[in-house]
Structures are given as C-alpha cells and as structure tokens.
Amino acid sequence: MSVIKRPGAFILLASGLSFGGSWRGALVDLRCFESEEHNVNPGDSLTYVDRNRSWEIRFCAPRLKSKSFAFVDADGLSFRLDPDGNRRAAELVRKTGKRDLFQVVVNGEKNGNKLMVDSIAASN
C-alpha cells in the first residue's frame, strides 16, 4: 500500500510547485502595489477585510517608467513577474500607453508567487 502512496504523493507535490496556463487579470506597478499592500494599521487584525483591491489596482496602474510589475488575478492574488515578464510588460505598457486599469492576459508558468511569462497581451 505504501508503494502506491509514495508515487502519488510525489506527483501531487510536484504538480503543486509550478504549472503552466493562461490567466486574465490586472497588470500593476510592483513597487506601488506592494507599498499599498503593506500600508495597514499595525493594530488591525483584519487587513484583508478593510482593503479596496479595485482602488489599489487602479492607483497602481503601470506608468511608462515602471520597470517591475505584478499580475493581480480575479481573486485578488498577486504574482511577481520574472525578469523576462517585466521586460515584456514594460514593452506592452510603452506600446499601449497609460491606462487607469491595465487588463491583461498572461501565458506562462506559476511558481509559488512568481509568474514565468511566455507572453503577455492587453485585453478588454
């Protein structure tokens, strides 16, 4: 019985480490977004209840000079982009111009809280 459990456990753990896919969400300036995420009252124990994620995403929309980016999915989870993803995102922002809300489709691989980006495109 344990012989069957070990390969199954290994496959389950390995699949949780990284997986490829396509995701829709918002592109944000990483420094701004992380600053907003950490801008909480130290005595507040309900930091996720008091958040206005939509405002944070709009406030931290990427600028033409942004160099580091994060992707925020529909559930409000944020993922840092890898260096190649940052390069692709900066190029996209320069081509598209400034927007109040920068919706994108990202193709790549999630590894923890980081996205290894294969492609990124603006979406409506």
Identify what each model region corresponds to.
Residues 1-9:
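Bacterial N-terminal signal peptides that target proteins for export
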Residues 10-14:
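Gram-negative bacterial Sec-dependent N-terminal signal peptides
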Residues 21-124:
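OB-fold and OB-like single-stranded nucleic-acid-recognition modules
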